[in-house]
Amino acid sequence: MSGHGAPDIDPTALDGSGLRVTVVAGRWHDEISAGLLAGARRVLDAAGVTTTVIRVPGSFELPVVARAALDAGADAVVALGVIIRGGTPHFEYVSDAATSGLTQASLLAGKPIGFGLLTLDDEQQGIDRAGLPGSKEDKGAEAAEAAVTTALLLKSIRGA
């Protein structure tokens, strides 16, 4: 499983009080998306951050809305989406655009975006990673942990 070797971060040890985090989540593949969102919210609530959730139509829209949230004052964004490979090149186009766009948004804003975009060969891979009952991984929680941890690290580096 891809989660082998993942860092062991205790979300209850994260003190994100004072941080503002926006979760931007796509609506495609609702069962998986809902699991990702629940995992992210659980971590953000435990860390004590102020959380805003914005739902977007799909993964292609994640970068522009993530950047807008960062420009509007969010300290970090958690980007959640699900793209499942089909029989056309559409999968590659959307996956590449969303991934590159999120990277650019983060770098240009100088703020972290937790990457919770699942690019999958089939629905079962998403269920296995969505933090649902019986799932092997919780990528929504992992993305939220990464966003909060990195936001705190950047605040420390910048002396804020």
Curated annotation (Swiss-Prot):
Residue numbers binding 5-amino-6-(D-ribitylamino)uracil: W28, S59, F60, E61, V82, I83, I84, F115
EC nos: 2.5.1.78
Pathway participation: Cofactor biosynthesis; riboflavin biosynthesis; riboflavin from 2-hydroxy-3-oxobutyl phosphate and 5-amino-6-(D-ribitylamino)uracil: step 1/2
Reactions this protein catalyses: (2S)-2-hydroxy-3-oxobutyl phosphate + 5-amino-6-(D-ribitylamino)uracil = 6,7-dimethyl-8-(1-D-ribityl)lumazine + phosphate + 2 H2O + H(+)
Gene3D superfamilies (alphabetical): Lumazine/riboflavin synthase
EC category name: transferase
Highest rank taxon of the organism: Bacteria
Residue positions binding (2S)-2-hydroxy-3-oxobutyl phosphate: G87, T88, R129
GO cellular component: cytosol; riboflavin synthase complex
GO terms under biological process: riboflavin biosynthetic process
Tagged with keyword Aminoacyl-tRNA synthetase: no
One Gene Ontology MF term: 6,7-dimethyl-8-ribityllumazine synthase activity
Protein family (similarity comment): Belongs to the DMRL synthase family.
Role description: Catalyzes the formation of 6,7-dimethyl-8-ribityllumazine by condensation of 5-amino-6-(D-ribitylamino)uracil with 3,4-dihydroxy-2-butanone 4-phosphate. This is the penultimate step in the biosynthesis of riboflavin.
Protein name, per record: 6,7-dimethyl-8-ribityllumazine synthase
Source organism of the structure: Clavibacter michiganensis subsp. michiganensis (strain NCPPB 382)
